[in-house]
């Protein structure tokens, strides 16, 4: 039996595992099996908080919404291409394909909006768990340049977007169904993004994996900048704690890093024209790996203001939103103009982690996901105790205790297989 996918629910009280023979749901504190079915090949599973509603991807293109308590199917949907990710909160259901994002009203399962995106094979996307700040974040789509080649009439329509070459994030209000901001996060393409539980903070990492940045949402002010390390690494998972005072990051180095979100606030305010410090979470599990090459800005910690070509005024960025987001008219552009901060120069050096965790070495015969690549992991922080929960691709669940006052290396307290 192969483990295909693993995720925490929105408040980290449950853990769901999709396998080649059904799926399992566990409580995290205490760790115990809550539900199990041994039927069907499940590619992806997502829970809706602690409810009995579960979203399943059964075949590459088929979504099933299931009530585990009643053991009944609520609805099924089939999509034109492979479903790469599913996100949900109490208001919205988000389906991520390689070049499209579908937004549904989760109460009625009515399709509300379809977003055309750049190719997104790693399903980089985050939905806030909050019903009020119901923001969706995804890589800013980049339009394909005009081509003089005219395809034959019988040829299928090609993709109108190209893969991103920089790490810009588009913030989309999934209640109002409009794009509201673009955040210039990294010079290199994005590898991982996550929103906190309140929908007020966005954490980002590029495909270099050396620098982690945290921005306020929706205004896009950069609040924190952290250095994970000097060598490139694939970021697998990022997670805020409930109070948004800690950010936990896992990567292909098999070291979990914890960063404090309270030390750089004064510095960021000094260097930002009007920074604010709102106060949360998300989760992701990546099934793929990207190549790496050094990124000068991320590796050396050069000032962030040099990462992007200079823009004369906010109108240029509004133009990007107009070109890349559907049905975003002049009224939206006017709103966005009030959100976008002007370029600022950051003078502080990225902060290091205050605590870290070394994952145990996997055993030689660990089956995991059937991949001999790096040990992949998903991280979350307990709501009740200073503990970090880690689930790895070789099928292990770890609980580590952290000293919140002194930091340092975390201590393994529990392990389940």
Swiss-Prot record:
Q: Where is this region: Disordered?
A: 261-314
Q: Which GO terms describe its biological process?
A: autophagy; protein transport
Does the record bear Repeat in its keywords?
yes
Identify the GO cellular component terms for this protein: endosome membrane; phagophore assembly site membrane; vacuolar membrane
Q: Which InterPro entries match?
A: PROPPIN (IPR048720), WD40/YVTN_repeat-like_dom_sf (IPR015943), WD40_repeat_dom_sf (IPR036322), WD40_rpt (IPR001680)
For bias type Low complexity, the affected ranges are: 262-278
- WD repeat segments: 1-36, 69-114, 139-182, 185-225, 230-269, 312-358, 370-410
- Where does the record say this protein resides? Preautophagosomal structure membrane; Vacuole membrane; Endosome membrane
Task: Tell me the membrane topology, using the record's own terms.
Answer: Peripheral membrane protein
Motif L/FRRG motif, which positions?
A: 226-230
Judging by the UniProt lineage, the source's domain of life is Eukaryota
Outline the subunit composition. Answer: Component of the PI(3,5)P2 regulatory complex.
**Function comment:** The PI(3,5)P2 regulatory complex regulates both the synthesis and turnover of phosphatidylinositol 3,5-bisphosphate (PtdIns(3,5)P2). Necessary for proper vacuole morphology. Plays an important role in osmotically-induced vacuole fragmentation. Required for cytoplasm to vacuole transport (Cvt) vesicle formation, pexophagy and starvation-induced autophagy. Involved in correct atg9 trafficking to the pre-autophagosomal structure. Might also be involved in premeiotic DNA replication.
What family, per the record?
A: Belongs to the WD repeat PROPPIN family.
User: Know anything about its domains from the record?
Assistant: The N-terminus might form a beta-propeller domain involved in specific binding to phosphatidylinositol 3,5-bisphosphate (PIP2), leading to the association of the protein to the membrane.
Report the protein name in the record.
Autophagy-related protein 18
Please state the gene responsible for encoding this protein.
atg18
